[in-house]
Every structure is written in C-alpha cells, then in structure tokens.
Amino acid sequence: MNFLRKIVKNCRDEDTQKPSLVSAPPDDDDLWLPPPEYVPLKELTGKKNMRNFCINGEVKVCSPNGYSFRILRHILRSFDEIYSGNHRMIGLVKVVIGLALSGAPVPEGMNWVYKLRRTLIFQWADSRGPLEGEELEYSQEITWDDDTEFIGLQIRVSARQCHIQGRIWRINMNSRACQLWSDMSLQTQRSEEDKDSSLLLE
C-alpha cells in the first residue's frame, strides 16, 4: 500500500489544494452508451441572458491501475457538495465536464487527460448565471480511495466571455455527456422560444 501511495503522489500536481474525499461507489456497473452525436441547428431566436464563453476545460484522471466510468460517475454524483468554485457558474462547469469526458482521453504518464477548447453559448433562466463580464478560473482535485483503488480527478475550467460565433449544435439525449449531466444533477429547463435548447437554472 505504501508503494501505491508513492506512485499516486507522482501523478498529482504539487500545488493543488487539499482534495475532497467521496464515499465508496455502489457495486452495480454502468451501461456503456454511444458517444455524443451532434445535430446542426438553426440560429437560436431567444437572446435573453445569452452569453458566449471561450472555454478551456481539462479533466485529468490519475489512477495507477486504470479506471472505470462507474467510479467517475459516482464521484460526480457528489459534485454539488464538493464544488469549490464560483456558484454562479456551477452550471457552466458541469456542462464543460460532461462535454470534456464525452471525448477521447490523451494518455499522459499515469494520467488520462480529457480536454475541451471551444466557444460555447450558454443561456440562463431569469437572473441566474454569472454577472456581466464575469470570468472563471476554477481548479479542484477530488479523490476516491479505498484499500484496492485510488482515483484522483483534477478539474480545471477557464471561461471568458467573448464574441466569437460558432455553429449551433444539439446533443443527443442518449450521449455520455447527458448521462454525466444527470449524474451531476445539472438543473435546466426547456426554452419556451427554442424547443431544442435548454436554459440553465444554476
């Protein structure tokens, strides 16, 4: 076990804050769903509380013995309780995490790194969401550990409001991203103006 601890220490950043611990996952395994499918949409008509953000997101999974999405999903189910960032932008962070983890990881030593760099359009309901011009620099490490397995999850999200306009897509409701958003209890409501889009409630 001491040997495992030494290995784990090498795949953590030295400057990260004290990680948050989560409890053990259930025994049942998850069902693998197909990767996200994106369908082109026309321009959104509702412009209320809509903002473009240039996103730089990264989720780094550190585990000497590999990992399963069952445990990642279990960790993310506790996200509301362990999130340490700006709570006006927790919905944005959840969206980025789900999209990043629905992509393909890049191996980096004993880590697997999921990255997302793109411009995303967000719409918040009512007066929710970040203040005008507000930016986000969020970084947190979350760990899951027992006698047989260790997983460290390093999450970094940078979000800056921008005026870059990209294509608009609709994500398949059976995608892994939607599965992860459900695990994180992402709060949304369907837009009354655009039936294929949702408004963030957090």
Curated annotation (Swiss-Prot):
> What, per the annotation, is the impact of changing residue 170 to C?
In strain: Isolate Germany
Instruction: Establish whether keyword Glycosyltransferase is in the entry.
Output: no
One GO cellular component assignment for this chain's record is: host cell endomembrane system
**What is the protein's membrane topology class?**
Peripheral membrane protein
Q: Where in the cell is it found?
A: Virion membrane; Host endomembrane system; Host cytoplasm
One GO biological process this protein is involved in is: viral budding via host ESCRT complex
Motif PPXY motif covers 35-38
Q: What else is known?
A: Most abundant protein in the virion.
State what this protein does. Answer: Plays a major role in assembly, budding and uncoating of virion after membrane fusion. Completely covers the ribonucleoprotein coil and keep it in condensed bullet-shaped form. Inhibits viral transcription and stimulates replication. Plays a major role in early induction of TRAIL-mediated apoptosis in infected neurons. Inhibits the integrated stress response (ISR) in the infected cell by blocking the formation of stress granules.
> What does the sequence similarity comment in the record state about its family?
Belongs to the lyssavirus matrix protein family.
Any domain commentary? Late-budding domains (L domains) are short sequence motifs essential for viral particle budding. They recruit proteins of the host ESCRT machinery (Endosomal Sorting Complex Required for Transport) or ESCRT-associated proteins. Matrix protein contains one L domain: a PPXY motif which potentially interacts with the WW domain 3 of NEDD4 E3 ubiquitin ligase (Potential).
Protein name per Swiss-Prot or TrEMBL: Matrix protein
